[in-house]
Amino acid sequence: MANSSYFISPTKGQMSPAAVVADIKDYLHQDPQAFYRLVIGSDSQERRIDGVKEANYVTAVVVHRVGHGGRYYWRNGTRQVVHSLREKIYKETQLSLETASSLVPVIRKSLNGSHNWELEIHIDVG
């Protein structure tokens, strides 16, 4: 299964990456004086199918208005055979970095430096 091209929002349902960026921008505009953390991370769940160990990957994008809640979006990633813990951690990291490299420049451009936020790539090691 290829990495999904859309995200899921618990409140808005299926969203394109462009819609996620627009929603993040709108959320930050609601309280421009607040401080925000944009956290992008991936995780996986292993299972065995016919004796073959496989992992299903999920990537989340979280916008945390520090002290006041937040929003999140997620998407299913790839399924692949897992040979080692190292390989699984590398894949999780790769998915997070790919998501950040596609979304963050667009978010920065759409905000035009108008908001106080920081980026965090969450890597779950182990």
Language-model features, listed with the residues they occupy:
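Acidic helix/loop or adjacent segment enriched in Glu/Asp that either coordinates divalent metal
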Residues: 79-114
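Short helix-terminating capping/connector loops at secondary-structure junctions
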Residues: 32-34, 110-117
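Acidic, metal-ligating active-site segments
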Residues: 40-41, 47-74
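Conserved active-site and cofactor/substrate-binding residues in soluble primary-metabolism enzymes
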Residues: 15, 19, 56, 91-94
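Short secondary-structure capping micro-motifs at structural edges
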Residues: 46-51, 81-85
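Basic, amphipathic N-terminal segments that precede the first structured/catalytic domain
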Residues: 1-46
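Short glycine-rich or small-residue beta-strand-to-loop segments that form or flank ligand, phosphate
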Residues: 39-41, 120-126
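Short acidic, S/G/P-rich loop/turn micro-motifs used as interaction or catalytic elements
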Residues: 45-48, 94, 126
